[in-house]
Structures are given as C-alpha cells and as structure tokens.
C-alpha cells in the first residue's frame, strides 16, 4: 500500500460500541425543543432560520463508535462536526436524543456525575491548543492529573512519561510562548493522554498546523494508538487526514450524517453526488486497496496482499499472464483474486449517483 495511508482491517469494525448516539437533535434558540417535530417533518435548515429564528445544529444523528478505534467525523464548515463532538461530554446540551458510554446514559448524569465523567472517562484536544501560558510544559501536562486529585509534585513527575511520548523530552520547563505551534499541540496531546481517559475527543486538533507538522502529528497519534488503544473521536474537514487515520468515517452536511462506513466503503460506494464530489480529488490509486475490488475464485498469478494499493497492484497485474493475481490475507491465505480490468475500473468514479439536495 502507498506510504502515508493507514491499513484498515475490516474486522476492526466489528468491535463493540464504546459510545452510542441515537436520534440526536440540536436546535439552537430559546425554543429549540418545540421545533423537533417540524424538523422531523422536513422543515429545512434555512426555513427554520428564516421563519423561526432558530438554527439547526444536528438532525437525527445515529452513530455507534467502536471501542479502541478512531472514528473520524468530517464535513465542511458549518456541517455540525464540532457541535456533535461537544455533545459527547455535554459541553453542549442536546434538544433531544440519547448518548451512552459503556451503556451509561450521559444525558441523565447529575452535575457531580458529569464532572467525574469528564475527569475520568474523556479528555479533549482543541484546535487552539488551550495551554495555560503561565505554566511550564510539565505543569500543563500535569494539569489534568491535579484536577483528578493528584498532588502537584506527583502529577508533574507522571507528566514526564507523556512529554517523552510526544517527543518533547528536554522541554519540560519551557513555557508555551517558547514553543512552536506544532510543539504546543504536542503538549495539548500529552495533557489529554496523561489523564488515562479511555475516550479522546479531538476537535480539529491538527487543522491549524502547517502541512508537514500536521503529518508529523498524525504519525505521533497513530504510533501512540498502537499501544494505548483509545476510543478516539477525531473531527476534521480534510479528507486526506480522515482517510489516513480513520478506522471509520462519518460525513456530515447541514447537521445530518450523509454517509458512514470505513474508508474503503466511502471511496468505493459514495452514497450520493455530494459524497462523490467530496472525494473526487483523491488519488484513488493510492487509497483503494485490492481487497475492495477482489473477486471470488483462485488464480495462478502472483500473490498480492489484500491491503496492497491499486497503484502498486497495477504494476504487477500488467506483467502477469492473463493479467490477474491471487489475493492473500495477512496470514498468507488465499482469499480471492483480482484482475487488471477490475483494478482499472475502480480508478474511475461513477458519473451519476443519487442526487443530493445540492445537485437537484
């Protein structure tokens, strides 16, 4: 597979849900709850704003987020991404719906229970770093631990492990103003990890960084995830970033999920023209994997790993007799075959799909 994109094991999507969101609505305004039925009956976001002065933030969100996986939520500006992630720890209260974590109802929690939930079950990384300017790197990273009740000295000592994990060893006594933007975001990530919360919420965490630094932060996150196995909800507007780090992706538009699935499903089976337009500029040869275009049966051709990119597979298929290869899993077992024609066909998008409202 081409360097830079993550190998997605289809089996990962079978993990039990850590977090469940059901029939979630958010309407901003003094009487938001009174317009739920109107939204269910089809009133548009623009009509709700023009005629009633209320803003539709989320529209019937249903999403199961698997344990220990990275769930990407993406969409254009104003699609509801940040609104959705802030419902998980109730920084925003919903107008209607259900949110459960480990089958515990988040919306029924008392203020005391919610405070404990935020301290111990979730941690958050923001786009704007949100570091305390008067505290050192070590003190910033230790901050969440002190909130949990750790003595400051003990918390600071524990912080060194996480500072080292994000590559900032030696910068413990520096202040945020003495760090670059990328280094500051590493501190933010270390602070979130230090609390050992099982759920990590990342709201456009890398969006403000330069491309090279952004890629570096993605690498750090993926390397840490191999060991930590967090349940991560990752917000982005960047498709390349979503494809690179996500086990699953949900794409929002006007507060509604238009499509959800693993990266291969999103690319190979876009739900409508809106999604098709969203993915039109990706390099399909680098992103689509052989397993997405393989067929039943066997072949005497050279074996190709199921996660091999089409770009790499085409070079081999073109030189094989009958232009076909066998496909093997990560244990070397044959699981199907792939042909040159199938690989070439997958490089081209379908020209006409189900029309979204934007294209009607």
PLM features per residue range, with description:
Residues 194-198:
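A short, proline-enriched helix->beta-strand linker immediately N-terminal to the Walker B motif
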Residues 135-142:
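Short coil-to-helix segment of the ABC ATPase nucleotide-binding domain corresponding to the Q-loop/switch region
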Residues 175-179, 183:
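Conserved ABC ATPase signature
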